[in-house]
Amino acid sequence: MKKIAVLTSGGDAPGMNAAIRSVIRMAVFLHCKIVGIHRGYSGLLEEDFRPLTNRDAGGIVLRGGTMLKTARCPAFFDEDNQKKGAQILRNHGIEGLIVIGGDGSVQGAAALSSLGIPTVTIPCTIDNDMHGTDETVGHDTAVNAVVGAVGRIRDTASAHDRAAIIEVMGRFAGNIALDAGIACGAEYILVPEVPFSREKLARSLIGQMKEGRTNSIIICAEGADDGRALGDWLKERTNIDICTTILGFIQRGGRPSARDSILGSLLGAAAVKALLDGQITSLIGMNKGEIRILPYSEAAKEKKIFKKGLYTLAGILGAAQEDEDIAESGL
């Protein structure tokens, strides 16, 4: 291959720029022209392209967001638009495409591959919910952002003898809530993978207050419950002063952690090598510290396995062990 392209798609995640930088530098090192596509698949359909050089990679590794911009593009699920995108790439002489993003981005890349465009994907999402890699680019930074925020919230909750609900991202996967909850010592962690009982949670909070615990941290993934609604319900049910914080996009932005910068750099370089070596139609992930190249067909077979052992540990370390388990049923 003499000319390849790179795009970022879907939700942004810290470390995307590290991956882009690595893709550019490795492509240039291997004497391959590299083209950037702005705003993901939307930019592909609109032919919003620009040539990239080593100079474009300068100073971006520690920046959040993505220098190529990103967008969600529901239109790209349409087969006619997929064919249009493939033809546009051919018209520009682009022989391969590196996609940086999450599950939806993989679907778009797989569609282009089925139309004869060689593609590889770098898993990049704060949710860490992609099968085929132990960790996705952006997850570590998001977890650190939550841990930092919870530390500040606990200080003020403690000063006022309050319980605090912190709602974090994770509609279908509770990895941010689980990892951050373990790291910051949350008393309760609510995730979509494990339905919980509001009533049991209320009884546990009341029991904790009677035992002298004047504040508790409840980390709630958005897919487990609505944080504000839960807070209002618990206030009425328990008469405990409860504050609710929705962290929102603070989890996506900011300088990537060293871990995410390194991971993005490793996967970016590996993606270029895989594409040029013909290891196409693949997800480039990390498994037990080693680069893993997984065909899309295998990556799409199953969802990432929920960390049941870590969730059980969270219950032991948190308040739930002292009262009844708040889960509706055991794992």
Where do the PLM segments sit?
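C-terminal non-catalytic interaction/assembly regions of soluble proteins
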Residues: 226-229, 234-331
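N-terminal phosphate-binding or glycine-rich loops at protein starts, especially the Walker A/P-loop
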Residues: 1-45
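Short Gly/Thr/Asp-enriched flexible loops that form oxyanion-binding sites at enzyme active sites
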Residues: 18-23, 103-117, 177
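Solvent-exposed alpha-helices and their adjacent loops that cap or buttress functional pockets
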Residues: 1, 27, 59-62, 89-92, ...
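Accessory alpha-helical/coil subdomains and C-terminal extensions
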Residues: 99-101, 111, 139-241, 245-247
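Glycine-rich oxoanion-binding loops at beta->alpha junctions
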Residues: 44-97, 104-105, 137-148
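Short, ordered loop/turn segments at secondary-structure junctions
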Residues: 9-12, 32, 37-42, 72-73, ...
